[in-house]
Amino acid sequence: MMNSRISIIIALSCIMITSIRAYDPDALQDLCVADKSHGTKLNGFPCKETLNITESDFFFAGISKPAVINSTMGSAVTGANVEKIPGLNTLSVSLARIDYAPGGLNPPHTHPRATEVVYVLEGELEVGFITTANKLFTKTIKIGEVFVFPRGLVHFQKNNGKSPASVLSAFNSQLPGTASVAATLFAAEPALPEDVLTKTFQVGSKMVDKIKERLATKK
């Protein structure tokens, strides 16, 4: 009986350790401002020397106003993550502002390292996500309303209105990562084997080439 209990405790401990390591590491000190000039590579960033830390390491003004939208998708994402705010290192949080032109789309994508919560600053958006069972959850959200996109699931936002729209996004990761579905498949470098794409989408090579060509211009 004792051996069984010990085995269960060990198994639960392993599960807890695995769960903890699946998210950003917890901070073990007051500050660990990212030192991006350091050559060391690790899961995160090494800490800047305390004497070199300034208030600027915790400040970013880049999401205070709408971004200039010049993409063919009609949207612009301005991240406020550890790459812009070094003081976010080890804190497991970040923000982003997304601005949409009328009819603008933030195309289907995933965040492999974070759940996302969006808060509507301006306009009205159609938003949604798809589960691994191919179930679509979609809703129209307006100013002051919130919608959640679970971690790792494909999701999108679209401005169906005739005026601009904006949201503020919050993430439970200092660097959530973004993988666009279309770009991941059709604009990978090196390119995904063509027969993989033709068989997956049940289309011919000419169609694959046409999609690649169009995506290449959508920067």
From Swiss-Prot:
Disulfide bonds: 32-47
Keyword S-adenosyl-L-methionine: no
Domain Cupin type-1 residue range list: 59-209
Binding site for Mn(2+): 109, 111, 116, 155
Location within or outside the cell: Secreted, Extracellular space, Apoplast
Key words, A-Z: Apoplast, Disulfide bond, Glycoprotein, Manganese, Metal-binding, Secreted, Signal
CDD domains with a match to the protein in the record: cupin_OxOx (cd02241)
Record InterPro entries: Cupin_1, Germin, Germin_Mn-BS, RmlC-like_jellyroll, RmlC_Cupin_sf
Quaternary context: Oligomer (believed to be a pentamer but probably hexamer).
Role this protein plays: May play a role in plant defense. Probably has no oxalate oxidase activity even if the active site is conserved.
Family recorded in the similarity comment: Belongs to the germin family.
Protein name: Germin-like protein subfamily 2 member 2
Gene source species: Arabidopsis thaliana (Mouse-ear cress)
